[in-house]
Amino acid sequence: METMQLDDTELRETAKQLYESYSTVLSESKLASILQDALGDFAPVLDSKYAARKTINNLVMGYYPNEATIKANFIDKVLFPLNPANISIFELPIGNSRVDMCKVNGHSAAYEIKTDLDTFDRLDGQMSDYFDVFETVYVVTSEKRWQELPSYVPDACGIYSYRQDARDGSYHFKAQRRAIKSTDLDSEKQLMVMPKRALCETFGISGKGMSKPAIVQECLAENGQAKINRLFKAYLKQRYGAYWEHFCKVKPQVFGIDYEWFYRNRLEPGIVY
């Protein structure tokens, strides 16, 4: 590819620019124009149906290690090869936070991604929210930063590090510390994740004329922590199972830069690409 005539610094800047201009729903001709504007004389010949989209994806995935890039690689290398019965969820709101990825089956796990573009300043609040709701919690960060994490996260928090191979741009993940399963979950916070209708259906409450907080209090009064945790996990699987199932089906046809978009929208790649 002629873009390799650019040095690494130029490629990183170009990849950042392309990511900021990119949208999954843009046409191939529009993407070709964006690519031409960014690369100028270094733009490659676009001689196939998805050439512009593929080139942008490859540059972003290889030279701009932001959250979307790391998340896509973490899915490919860590989450996807696990038990196929696991349901993974993108960007789930929890308390005052939004967890980057979580998975649920027999047990629940949260994964917070901190790239080299991020600070660790928000981890205190995020960890508080995640440990209240999920049985295990992990933070994913770069190989050069992971040893700083123990100062920011509880001892029970697991740690994954990632590094990028300088030869081919591929990412490699390593479990640096195993998460310890939490036994002190906040049932009220779990219930608040669920919408009012799901609470009523799951716990057999009519809910008529009741506010959501009142329904939550009734659930707490009539059910123990273990049962609420079990039903909370069952709700997540039921609510997001179709999203993950569709994503798994279309994943081989989808570029990494578009993973989250196709997960959320559940469309066929042929309609968009």
Model feature map: region roles:
Residues 1-64:
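Interdomain/boundary linker segments immediately adjacent to catalytic/signaling cores
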Residues 56-62, 73-74, 78, 179-181, ...:
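Eukaryotic low-complexity, intrinsically disordered regulatory segments enriched in serine, proline
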Residues 62, 66-105, 153:
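Active-site metal-binding core of divalent-cation-utilizing nuclease and nuclease-like domains
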Residues 91, 162-165:
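Conserved beta-strand termini and adjacent loop/short-helix elements that scaffold enzyme active sites
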Residues 101-103, 107-117:
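Conserved catalytic cores of phosphodiester-cleaving nucleases, focusing on short active-site segments
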Residues 117-163:
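Catalytic cores of nucleic-acid endonucleases
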Residues 168-240:
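A conserved mid-domain beta-alpha-beta active-site/ligand-binding segment of alpha/beta enzyme cores
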Residues 226-273:
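C-terminal, charge/polar-rich interaction regions
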